[in-house]
Amino acid sequence: MRKIRLYIAISLDGWIAKPDGDVAWLDQIPTPEGEDYGYAEFYAGIDTTLMGFNTYREVLGFGIPFPYPDKTNYVFTRQTDQADTEHVKFITADPATFLRELRIGPGADIWLIGGGQLNSALLQHDLIDEMWVFVMPIVLGHGIPLFAPPLPEKQLTLLHHQTYPSGVTLLKYEPRS
């Protein structure tokens, strides 16, 4: 079965973006030359991405070509008038139902890009198999949370942790059985 893997950056106080969805604060984090925080290896292990519509709009606002053209990309939305694009399939179905089917199909692992609402929906339905959470050395004060409330209590098992010279800390978890 394919794994759904959350790979995401958060501020020390738990925000994935500013209230307006802006993630430019990530550019303030020093990244030593040649350090990709495991991204290349992670990206090579997935063939599908998942994101909510607000996250998709933020990605389009980066002013670069769509960054995942070599993957199958699903964007979850409540807007039924969205037409699929060259790189994106819009999904209006219930995320949990859709992803239960997708996981049992052929393919590599699946990257849950976010945002907070989709992260929360998948967590509530036990559909996140791994969480790669990169804690950035910055306090934002307010913003969009990693998981939108309400949330059930979930116990996690720490699989790996790593602190980088930049102050970024990776916490890799899986749900406790």
Regions from the PLM with identified roles:
Residues M1-S177:
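Enzymes that bind and transform nitrogen-containing heteroaromatic metabolites
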